[in-house]
Amino acid sequence: LIWFLMLGILGTAQLSNNWSVLTALNPYYAYDLIVNRGGFWLLGAVFLCTTGAEALYSDLGHCGRTNIRISWAFVKTTLILNYFGQGAWLLAHEGEKLNGITPFYGMMPTWFLPFGIALATIATIVASQALISGSFTLINEAIRLNFWPKAKIKYPSDLKGQLYIPSVNWLLCAGCILVVLYFKESTRMEAAYGLTIILGMLMSSRLLTFFMKIKHYWQPLIWGFVITYLVVELSFLIAQMDKFLRGGWISLMIAVLLSTTMFIWYYARKIRNRYLE
């Protein structure tokens, strides 16, 4: 709550100096950017602004659908205000040499900068915990569906959905260490992360389409959903493809390893059960 309040306040403070940034809400500018020569490829550069949307409901078992939906309205508002504030800050410093200063930290008053960095570090730790908890939930579901090898699951409290899988925790630890050793700098991780996010979004859309089909939703609604989201997500995917050789291949390699493990485990159990019967 403190982190997102800070984002909103910083953004609003800068936005008050240049309200013209709000014209970015006009969809025409998005269309103009995409159709103009070279503008389309900028989608790959700005895509990390959507970070978090691909895992919005990964903590469904921990937080509940209603809590996530209500909090998302607040989170999105503060994020938009902060991005507008960064835009206003960049316009105010147009033509200047920034010397490595990022708009996010540039918006902060000098006296507040240490507090802002500390709060950003704490927010990163909290966000990492959300990813770890979401991984436990997904692996637990995969085990129940016989898509993942059996693993020891601990329930540290009586609260619904609270669980801990030691083997997954160690896998995440090893993965983080290896990724950091390979990329060395956070800026070099953008390629792998961006490609991961869009592939996750495409998979979520595919699964939701499958769900709508088996639940016999109205066909025009299904097609409307598929066309709308495919246009948006495929556009971002195409714009991200140039990042494949700059680290994006690592995301695909990890995805292939996990998918292969799930495939082998599932069909091996089917073969074994067939002989047992």
Where are these regions (language model features)?
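The structured alpha-helical core of multi-pass membrane proteins
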Residues: 1-277
